[in-house]
Amino acid sequence: MQKGMEVGIFTFWTSKDNYGQTLQCFALKYFLNHQNGMNAEVIRYYATKLPLIVRIKNAVKRILLYICPSINRSQYENIKSLEERNFAKFKKYHIKYSSSTSYGKIELNKVSGKYDALITGSDQVWSMLLDNPDNSVYYLDFGNKKQKRISYAASFGLQVYPSNIIGELHNQLSRLDYISVREEDGVDICNKAGVNSVHVLDPTFLLDKKIYEKLLKSPPAISYTFMYVLNIQDGDDIDWNNLRKEIATSLIIGTNGSGYTSSQVILDGIVYENSTIEKWLTNIAYADMIVTTSFHGVVFSIIFEKEFVFIPLKGRHAPSNNRVLSLLNKLDLTDRVLFENRTFKQIEKNKVDYEKVNHKLDRFRSKSIRFLMDSLIAK
């Protein structure tokens, strides 16, 4: 093992309300640094830099909203919700970032030379299609030739890659020394691009549950169901009127996902919270039941060994179901999916056998860790 190895993690990192994005950054950094003695950090990168005049206008607009919220109530509520979530505090204390921010590939080349290895992923970094040449950075086309280039649990966010750019995908993937993807669909796409890849776990699974338990806060005093529902417009998208009748607890706590504010009450009868990272984890860890449309909502339900129900999305967001179904299929948990031929009550009656799940998960985790560590220490 190469203690002190310098590793640059290249992934999505800017969100102020995406719990999964932030926790996968935390998990990969923690695994490499605290459990394996490396010096890994998330590379701060933007494709472009906003002109100074635009940044000044945005700052003035923010000040005016505080002085007079009625100017734009929805924008004001959005700012307030982000402050309540307070991702900045979690990132400051729990995630290491590069000391400088790179704007564009030229600056990225200047600062990335210090790393012994570069890792792209996790998250849907390869959903950034290669018909835009700027997106090749997610295939690590920067730095120097001596650096190891690894993808860890990278996701395409697609079942089928556009055929007109599959040749360019081959070129970009061929640059990488070691390739792993988060979904089985990703393995298929890599095969069609003419490269081999390994199916691995999301980095949040690399850590023991005890690591996350150290982040937990005091739980609510009474029993509750936790709802973490993304990418719906109204209750009809998940048949909420009928679903609400089947949920046993009187208290339902909900956290809106990216793009929603506290003023947007999507589902009646829910107590909404703009949770911090720690409170979001707490709400999952102590819930009687988790109901979610989210990949990381499912992930942390499994990590904390909770009863959960996954509701597949419909319409234009339906492709995002694939990453969840890939994971559930691997762990023999597809009976937790609220398909149209099942009811919530039917799923609720069948308790998750976490002894069997953890046996499968441990083997998959060992395979994932072996891939990552072998890739990093290979000569």
Where in the sequence are the language-model features?
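Active-site anion-handling motifs in enzyme catalytic cores
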Residues: 1-379
